[in-house]
Amino acid sequence: MSAPTTTDPVARARDAAARESWAEAYELLHDHDRHPERGLTADDLSVLADSAWWAGHIDESVTARLRAHAAYLAADDHRGAGLTSWWLYYEYAGLGRPAAAAGWLHRARHHLEDLPDCPEQCFLAMTAAEEASARGDHESALAASRRMTALALACGSPDLLALGRQAESRVLLAAGRRTEGIALLDEAMCAVSAGELSGMVTGWLYCLALTQCMEAADFARAVEWTNAAMEWCAPPWTGSPPDGNADTAAPATGTAPATEDTPAAMTPLPMTVPSGENPFRGVCRAHRVEVLDLLGAWALAEAEARQACREVPVDCLESAAAAYYAAGDVQRRQGRLEAAAVSYGHAHELGRIPQPGLALLRLAQGRADAAVAGVDLALACRSDPDHDVLGRARLLAARTEVALAVRDLPGAARAAAELDALAGAADGGVPLLRALADTALGSVALAERRPGALLPLRRALAGWLELRVPYEAAQVRMLLAAACRAAGDEEAARLELGTARAVFERLGAVPDARRAAALLSGGSRRRLPGGLTTREAEVLRLVASGGTNKDIAGALVISEHTVARHLNNIFAKLGVGSRTSATAYAYAHDLV
């Protein structure tokens, strides 16, 4: 498209906005608006508000939109005033000002509800669907979303039609109608990938779709749309990322262990969007962090989390909270417990309940009671899984793990059974939920010493491998090794342990790698010297490797009190009085 020939800055700004060259439009209108004698129309003020938002000036966007509303009212344009009111509702809600948001939503309804059918009413219908869905009134939510779609079809707007399909998809997913919901989401995303939509709606739909995919535990779609979203967000965010952009590279499948160069913890960062950047970039990157975490690209996930928190606009702080939480999960599994605690704390400050990660951190620290209380409270706060199936599934998986750690077999069995029911209720089957459920069922069967543990564990391993989720697959291999060893198949146990250890070492999951190494060393002999039990031998090996009681508790997922009790028993059985003497015994008897 050739450059505009007019010298009128407002006309040039309108042309720039039509081309979605928002930085140019903002600069022209911002400069023009500095002179009070040069008035802007209501439409021009709306363009200034939009361009200020894209340029990262949220407060200026709100101010311009307030002026636009007044100008529409002065012109007796209720459609313009109604749409502007709705956008003010949306912006104030994102800024954490619910009272102001509610007032502007009421104004939007006042302006639009009594008018004949018009495109602006689509936004009221979308909000009505969200409110009804939040109440659990799926019937009303579905009716509202379908009204939005009907209005969009009547006015011929691709933007509104795609938003209507997405809104209906979300309602259907919440109602448990997964197959229908996913089909509508795919239809909406076709319009996105084909470049049929405006930049605002494209970014909006990417963010909504990524959230829906993860909440619905549809990992394959989450990976696909995350990669597409990051390509679209890449400068100059016209749909074609520049060559060599690191953000568009295929995710790595593994990472090196944490080193001294790795930051100990993620510190709070200013969350502002640099002028000219895509405001959706940080939000999409935050979603990417969760995908990279599952894929085992931990170093990249942590780096991306840090970058996301720099890019997330101030009206999307929940995305920064999600990035901090994901970084905490990486740090916890790598044994960087203090750094994980800091990251979970930042997530909590930004409004996210940092569970189940915080409960698993407390378990690794030997604070089993705090772990139980944390995950139980989080489950009580999420009694309705409709809007976040994966979130509840992860809590139930953690509840199973924590219960087994404190030898609460009935509690573990209940959590695993609920997780199994959740996976079974998913329309069409969900591989990620099924793998979580099979892992929990197998771990409970193993703890109860039931012969049927191998079957669900084999299913779980196959599921995680198919999803290409390495850490969880390696964890299942540890359980399979225990089941094989209990069945007398030492060779199979050692194969599983060796593979698990290699994965843990590649990921930098230090505590798990140590645990696998200890179990490998212990499997070569049937009778342990000194009358030691298998667990006592594991503790002794970790003592000999220089581990503190805290290190040993984290590696074996037991409390420090239990470690101390094991050490007392070891000292008594071996007739030694110090860790040094116990270490010497371990080396003398080939226990290390």
What are these regions (language model features)?
Residues M1-D8, G345-A347, D386, A425-L433, ...:
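TPR-adjacent "capping" and linker segments in tetratricopeptide-repeat scaffold/adaptor proteins
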Residues M1-D8, T238-T267, R526-G530, V592:
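Actinobacteria-biased recognition of intrinsically disordered, low-complexity terminal regions
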Residues R12-A18, D43-G56, G82-P98, E120-D137, ...:
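Tandem amphipathic alpha-helical repeat scaffolds
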Residues A518-S521, R525-G577, S581-V592:
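Helix-turn-helix DNA-binding segment
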Residues Y26-R34, L66-D76, H106-P116, R146-G156, ...:
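Amphipathic alpha-helical segments of tetratricopeptide repeats
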Residues M1-F123, T127-R146, D159, R170-A183, ...:
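Inter-helical turn/loop elements of alpha-helical hairpins
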Residues D408, R414-A415, G429-R434, S443-A447, ...:
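Linker/hinge segments immediately adjacent to helix-turn-helix/homeobox DNA-binding domains
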Residues T149-G244, P263-P313:
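Internal metal/ion-chelating core segments
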